[in-house]
């Protein structure tokens, strides 16, 4: 089985690439969807978030208010508190998923789509976890693919996705800038990657790059 990490900054188009790879035959798991599942009531991550951040992050229906939690993390200076809770559980779940894929199909191309493949190791080191195998991307993946795009284009894409009707796009763009500050720049990610896809044109061009990538992964 080939273990592939697919990453890129907010608004880069990595989710689109993940969709193309799934169509081509890859097994794909999305870190965002996995993170949402881990934050559901009854999950250990949910309980720890409520313990650390307090009941104000819980809506009347018992679910986490993800916007309030994100504001505390990104604007309130508590991103490391959140990452300390979520990242280890998310990576462990990704590893379990890969093990399940291998049992089903030892020849599979298993793709983890995550914005923070490099950042989780950086953040672990900031917490003093110098030798953690769990977060070492070199050991987690056989290949790493980075999707890049100009920052202005990333921000515009994010704002359009968050506010498709147009209202609130300025606030969404400001939010994107805050989030991007916490992500490793494209140039640094690209220097570490095995493959780089440049998402500066239309989806047809990005799909063509993805097809070429798929052929290399399967070679």
Task: List where the protein language model places each region.
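N-terminal polybasic phosphate/anion-binding patch
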Residues: 31-40, 55, 150, 160, ...
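ATP-dependent NMP and nucleoside kinases share a basic, alpha-helical "lid"
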Residues: 95-104, 110-160
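C-terminal accessory "lid"/substrate-recognition subdomains
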Residues: 102-105, 177, 181, 185-191, ...
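ATP-dependent small-molecule kinase phosphotransfer cores
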Residues: 36-110
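Glycine-rich phosphate-binding loop of ATP-dependent small-molecule kinases
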Residues: 1-64, 104, 215-219
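Phosphate-binding beta-loop-alpha motif at adenosine-nucleotide cofactor sites
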Residues: 29-30, 193-205
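An amphipathic alpha-helix signature
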Residues: 46-50, 151-159, 173, 177
């Amino acid at each position: 089985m080939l273990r592939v990490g697919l990453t890129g900054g907010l608004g880069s188009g990595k989710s689109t690439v993940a969709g193309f790879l799934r169509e081509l035959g890859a097994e794909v798991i999305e870190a965002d969807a996995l993170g949402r599942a881990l934050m559901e009531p009854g999950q250990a991550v949910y309980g720890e978030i409520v313990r650390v951040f307090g009941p104000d992050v819980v809506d009347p229906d018992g679910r986490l208010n993800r916007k309030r939690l994100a504001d505390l993390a990104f604007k309130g200076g508590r991103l490391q508190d959140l990452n300390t809770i979520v990242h280890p559980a998310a990576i462990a779940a990704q590893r379990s998923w890969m093990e399940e894929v291998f049992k089903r199909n030892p020849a599979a191309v298993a793709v983890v789509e995550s914005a923070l493949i490099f950042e989780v190791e950086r953040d672990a080191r900031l917490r003093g976890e110098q030798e953690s195998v769990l977060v070492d991307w070199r050991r987690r993946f056989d290949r790493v693919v980075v999707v890049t795009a100009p920052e202005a284009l990333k921000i515009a894409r994010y704002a359009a996705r968050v506010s498709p009707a147009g209202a609130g796009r300025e606030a969404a763009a400001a939010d994107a800038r805050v989030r991007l500050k916490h992500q490793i720049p494209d140039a640094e990610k690209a220097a570490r990657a095995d493959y780089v896809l440049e998402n500066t044109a239309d989806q047809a061009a990005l799909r063509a790059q993805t097809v070429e990538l798929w052929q290399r992964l399967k070679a």
